[in-house]
């Protein structure tokens, strides 16, 4: 079972890797495709994968149900591989965006099918931990991308790669994703299909073999429970999501997804090296912006783990409130630094890490838990799709417009970064109000939550 969880969780690592690897290459991509004076198209190029993510998350459900979780994951692995090799080796702008879009389809689909597969194949006693491990690997993938970018840049700069080299450093950064993508795709041939899907296809004997292989203690009871669950799903009264009685869960999902993205996390993850270079104080042992990005990624990883361990102890509201205060202070200090035009020592790096840490233990750790909890069974799948789509749409939008905002002086004589991080700080303050308004769901059954939120 641990092997299956490891293989499936590589999908999460690829999810995070694909999201962050572009950060180290974005300045060179801008120059390579002549987008230096075209911030609109530079932002669009960066957001292409996220546009694919929206579509991938929307369309993956039916293929996963018709052809199985395992085959769907194999297709996702192939898409990751094609995207990494294609976008890294191509020198045509349109083809580059097409390959990045294919990678985005894989990210969106894996965000749905990966956790689904792990949840369906894991023994009940380990299910929560293995699903959480997938989420953890997303953040680990971000760190791996930053580390990969740093070593590739360091190697090529140290060895003085010629301008007419086969591939430029930024291309190697993107191609590097092909290694975990190939490993993921090949290893998927060593793991079984989801037993829940097999039972839904009347392939009970195969499902029984899978349960035996993963160490399920009471195979017959588990299979009976799945059959009963499938029967209940067929008989659940399906309802429209968008009606008055569901307005509070809808509003909660919309607000937490919106605050999650508009607090500025993608601006940090996608543009970290460029942002850190703007401080003008890259000196000393950690002078390389790529290395500073690694520090940011490790901070994200550490505090994501902390948030996951505290979410059922302190509760959703408390974590969001604590994180909101930290984000307000950190983003406010970044805005102040840009306003004064000075960042002493590693002030910007410290502030960015403080923001990322605050985000990771709050909005980062709680978003998917809250969205999964607030909707009743009759509309839960639709509600989760709505919350997920809200998240991805804002993610793509922010990534797209960030280069435009950075290059637009809204107030004469004032750095655009002052306005941008001032805005992020205001959004963080609104997160504090959201935490005050949000009903606490810690320690409550889904039925209790439904009674509190749904007004017939």
What are these regions (language model features)?
Residues 1-203, 211, 231-456:
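Alpha-helical transmembrane bundle of multi-pass membrane proteins
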Residues 217-218, 383:
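Conserved alpha/beta-hydrolase catalytic His-Asp/Glu region
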Residues 219-228:
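Short, well-structured alpha-helical segments
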